[in-house]
Structures are given as C-alpha cells and as structure tokens.
Amino acid sequence: MDISLPDAESTVEFGRQLGRALNEQYAEGGEQVHIILFYGDLGSGKTTFTRGFIEALPGGENAEVSSPSFTLCNSYPTTPSVIHCDLYRSEGALPDEVDEALDTESGLVLVEWAERIAAENLPRNVWTSCFKSAKITGW
C-alpha cells in the first residue's frame, strides 16, 4: 500500500492514526505486534512518524520523542511500553541493547534503519514500513 505523506504534520498524524489503531487492537485482545521495522533514507520521516505513533498511545501525550541515533534506544512509559531504536550508526553485529529489545515479548519495539538487521535475525511477527522521500524542484 502506498500512502502519500507530503509534510511532517501529515506524517505525524498518520503515526497517530496507526498508534490509536494498534492500541485498540491491544485493548480488544487482538493479535499483538511487538516489533515495527522502519526502512528509509535519512530524512524520509521515520522519526516523525514515530513521534505521532508514540503520542497516540496512553501515557505518550507529553513524550518528547527524538531520534535515538546516539543513544541507540529510547524508552517511553506508554501503554504498551515502547522501546525506540535507531541503527543508523550500527555496523556489523547488533548492539546488545537492540538485540535484547528484539527478543522482548511485551511492549513494542520500533526500529529505524532496520535494513541493518541481518535477515536471519529478523523476528517473525513484525510490521514493516518503508519510507521514501522525494524532492521536487523547479516549480
């Protein structure tokens, strides 16, 4: 499915919509996704989407969501709890904190730059999102 998100606000709002939908699914006892993988170029909207997603979860209304490029993982006290990881600076083997997060069966793990995870290390029950950006010039 292709969805056009022309600006940051529409990207945040789409994140909110999916966050609310996932929260409803959890509340109704539906299948629980524990890991969401994000693929996409630098600046394509992965963290912006994540901001809206986390804000939509109970407890996330006032969360200060930022890219965990330097910390590798940020935790948020939402319901369900969220661990937000960024593999942009990761090379080779997964850092321990990311590897441990991927093994969790409670809460949610959101991983940016998922293309840096070797195929054999990918969990089975995941959502995958690919972000693409385009710049139009000359208008």
Segments from the language model and where they lie:
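N-terminal pre-Walker A segment at the start of P-loop NTPase domains
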Residues: 1-25
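Hydrophobic anchor at the beta1->P-loop junction of P-loop NTPases
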Residues: 36-38
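The conserved Walker
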Residues: 42
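Conserved lysine of the Walker
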Residues: 46
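Short beta-strand-centered segment that lines the nucleotide-binding/catalytic pocket of NTP-utilizing
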Residues: 60-76
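Switch II (G3) loop of P-loop NTPases
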Residues: 84-91
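Short phosphate-coordinating micro-motif centered on Lys-Gly-acidic
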Residues: 93, 99-139
